[in-house]
Amino acid sequence: SEEEVVTRDYIQSGKADLVCILVDASQLERSLYMLADFVGIRMPVMLVLNMMDVAEAAGKKIDVTAIEKRLGVPVLGFSAAETERYPEFFKKMVSAIKTPVCLDSGSLREELVGGGELAEKTDDIISRIEAALGDFEYGVCEKIWIAEKLLEKDKLICGVVNEMLPFARKNAIDAILDSEEGRDGGIL
């Protein structure tokens, strides 16, 4: 969407002190795609698990401390409807700005691709694309993020890579994607 492009452009500018990723705690698994999409972007981040009250009312137990420990970034269980909790939110945010932490794509790689044969194949494709990218850099984005976006056929990233990457590397990436998808014609 247009809003996503504006948000992504601002984040990639590197001007933000902190990015707060707000997810729906009552539908945590479905909501974490936003966090997964942020892995590979070198920006300080804080995860806010909103609607904790709704999650708890549905009988869901969310261990905020365990999530924070696993991700290595500040995590706050929160309910935006409970206005008395806003000082706690702001305190956590200020602390996250003073001690900035980025998501570590290396330590989270297994969670990103999951397990099993399909996950191994996806990880192999991403690794091969990363190698083909060579020393290519794009703002605050790591190569794993760029590789994932190329695999997803993200139009913006495909366009940037097409414009900036040498012809031989573009061909190498297209060959990787074509061989894995059994298709012809490339994305770049």
Where are these regions (language model features)?
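Canonical P-loop GTPase G-domain recognition
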Residues: 53-114
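Generic serine detector
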Residues: 1, 13, 26, 31, ...
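Structured core elements
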Residues: 46, 76-79, 146, 187
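Helical mechanochemical/support elements of P-loop NTPase systems and associated helical scaffolds
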Residues: 3-6, 15, 30-34, 59, ...
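Phenylalanine-focused residue identity feature
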Residues: 38, 78, 89-90, 136, ...
